[in-house]
Regions:
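An amphipathic alpha-helix adjacent to DNA-recognition modules
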Residues: 8-19, 23, 28-32, 37-40, ...
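Basic K/R-rich, polyanion-interacting modules in nucleoproteins and related proteins
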Residues: 97
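Amphipathic alpha-helical packing segments from all-alpha helical-bundle domains
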Residues: 85-86, 102-140
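Residue-level recognition of alpha-helical structural elements
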Residues: 3, 76-80, 103, 124-128, ...
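N-terminal intrinsically disordered/low-complexity leader segments
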Residues: 1-7
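Cytosolic nucleotide-binding catalytic cores of signal-transduction proteins
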Residues: 8, 22-26, 38, 120-122, ...
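Short, solvent-exposed positions on alpha-helices
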Residues: 59, 108, 130, 152-153
Length: 153
């Protein structure tokens, strides 16, 4: 195994360990030592790859998004309705993960991703920034309510 493969293996082990531990307890109650013990890697390996536990979750979300996008290529006539449909289809595909985030009170990680992707940018004029923030927060609220109602539609 070369260094890239080893690093990928370690990150995978750490991510899987954190996800297993999240099934048992809150994120705030999980220590780095528990993660590394469960992952069977050293603390040095943890800190070589991550700053904190939040980074693991954010990176996992980006990984799943990239994987989903790779498997669901966009067409040129991709409309706003298509984008919304894609968001919900992605969440359904990774439903267990997002239910785990919701159950552990850390669903806000999804909001961070939505705001990064669809929210206002610093170069936007004020009105455009306000409108974009309104829409992005509305989409997050819609998804959150959809989860609360059992993801029925």
């Amino acid at each position: 195994m070369d260094n890239t493969e080893k690093n990928s293996y370690v990150k995978n082990q750490i991510t899987n360990a954190l996800l297993r531990l999240l099934k048992e307890k809150e994120l705030k109650d999980i220590s780095i030592s528990e993660i590394t013990t469960t992952a069977q890697v050293s603390r040095i390996s943890f800190y070589r790859n991550y700053n904190d536990k939040d980074t693991i979750i954010k990176e996992y979300i980006h990984l799943t998004l990239n994987e989903w996008n790779k498997n669901h290529p966009k067409t040129e006539e991709h409309t706003e309705d298509d984008i919304l449909g894609d968001i919900f289809a992605y969440i359904i595909e990774y439903k267990d993960f997002y239910l785990l985030l919701r159950d552990r009170g850390i669903f806000y990680f999804l909001k961070d991703i939505i705001m990064d992707a669809l929210g206002p940018k610093s170069e936007y004029p004020n009105f455009d920034a306000y409108t974009t923030a309104f829409i992005a927060n509305g989409i997050y609220g819609w998804i959150e309510e959809w989860f609360l109602r059992g993801m029925q539609e």
